[in-house]
């Protein structure tokens, strides 16, 4: 098969590799589209220390081509949205069967865009923060895939007010279409909130943003940290101070959950996929790239100039075999 590898010189190349075969409990997916996500920037930057050359890509859509021992052979040919441990930028990728989710009639570009972001947003709102009826929610990185989905899930959970924070006027304008009551610019946070306090804050940024977010929590409020895009200093929280106001600092790590409790992640993903298929939420695929432009796509994501979800066209795009 042909695959895109990230080589030791930080360039992406299309190369020929042996086609992987599924082991017990696994399926092989013939990839149609692959999602582009923040993990791809972390691989490029060496934050995920993987040996190179490495086939990146953590989100895929396509059809099941083969199954391993213990997997129903009736799944062969099934269209899926797959949460992948790596290797999605290839013609075929092997994935745990439990994390290859039946996509039904969801279009394959959208199924790739579903990726890790949709179940992450679902769990941030419903599992970690447990957003309740009438509660207020503040969402950082509001124009990203997780941010736009978290706003939609918060509305479905009954949130009374949803406020976002975005990095530019264009991104703020884009985010506004996903259920936010207000979207601030990053430079306006937190002053632009005045005295407003929130029951829930969702923060993938870290650093100063996380410190200020703790300060805008209402009594009994919950801040859920699920990333550190800022890469700044660790944020220290005084447990006794939090205790006196009933506030909580929580974390969420979908990647870890996929390794420790994959069925839990799959359950959330199936529920989220059902909401997508039913038209109750939308995954907004705003850009499709060809393999030759993968470096550009990852760079744009890193620079914060994208919004919504970007996907890579894979099927029929990796060239002919020699």
What are these regions (language model features)?
Residues 42, 79-141:
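NAD(P)H dinucleotide-binding glycine-rich loop of Rossmann-like/cofactor-binding domains
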Residues 9-11, 17-61:
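N-terminal glycine-rich beta->alpha transition that marks the start or flank
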Residues 187-196:
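Short amphipathic alpha-helix with an adjacent loop that forms part of the alpha/beta core around
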Residues 1, 262-322:
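C-terminal hydrophobic helical "lid"/dimerization subdomain
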Residues 44, 61-85:
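A glycine-/small-residue-rich N-terminal strand-loop-strand element
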Residues 114-186:
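Mid-domain Rossmann-like dinucleotide-binding core that forms the NAD(H)/NADP(H) cofactor-binding site
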Residues 208-278, 314-322:
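Glycine-rich phosphate-binding loop and adjacent beta-alpha segment
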């Amino acid at each position: 098969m042909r695959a895109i590898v990230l080589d030791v010189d930080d360039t992406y190349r299309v190369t020929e590799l042996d086609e992987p075969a599924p082991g017990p409990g696994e399926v092989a997916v013939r990839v149609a589209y692959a999602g582009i996500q923040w993990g791809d920037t972390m691989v490029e930057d060496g934050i995920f220390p993987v040996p190179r050359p490495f086939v990146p890509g953590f989100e895929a859509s396509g059809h099941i081509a083969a199954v391993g021992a213990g997997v129903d052979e009736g799944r062969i040919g099934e269209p899926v949205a797959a949460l992948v441990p790596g290797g999605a930028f290839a013609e075929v990728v092997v994935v745990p069967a439990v994390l290859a989710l039946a996509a039904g009639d969801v279009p394959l570009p959208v199924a790739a865009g579903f990726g890790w972001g949709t179940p992450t947003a679902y769990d941030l709102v419903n599992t970690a923060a447990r957003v309740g009826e009438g509660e207020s929610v503040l969402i950082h990185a509001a124009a990203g895939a997780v941010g736009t989905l978290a706003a939609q899930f918060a509305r479905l959970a009954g949130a009374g007010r949803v406020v976002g924070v975005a990095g530019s006027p264009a991104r703020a304008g884009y985010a506004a279409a996903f259920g936010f009551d207000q979207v601030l610019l990053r430079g306006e946070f937190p002053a632009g909130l005045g005295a407003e306090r929130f029951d829930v804050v969702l923060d993938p940024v870290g650093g100063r943003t996380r410190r200020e977010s703790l300060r805008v929590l209402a009594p009994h409020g919950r801040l859920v940290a699920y990333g550190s895009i800022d890469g700044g200093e660790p944020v220290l929280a005084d447990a006794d101070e939090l205790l006196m106001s009933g506030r909580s600092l929580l974390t969420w790590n979908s990647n870890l959950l996929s390794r420790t409790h994959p069925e839990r992640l799959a359950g959330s993903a199936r529920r989220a996929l059902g909401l997508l298929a039913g038209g109750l939420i939308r995954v907004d695929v705003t850009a499709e790239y060809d393999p030759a432009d993968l470096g550009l796509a990852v760079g744009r994501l890193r620079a914060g100039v994208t919004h919504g979800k970007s996907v890579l066209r894979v099927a029929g795009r990796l060239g002919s075999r020699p």
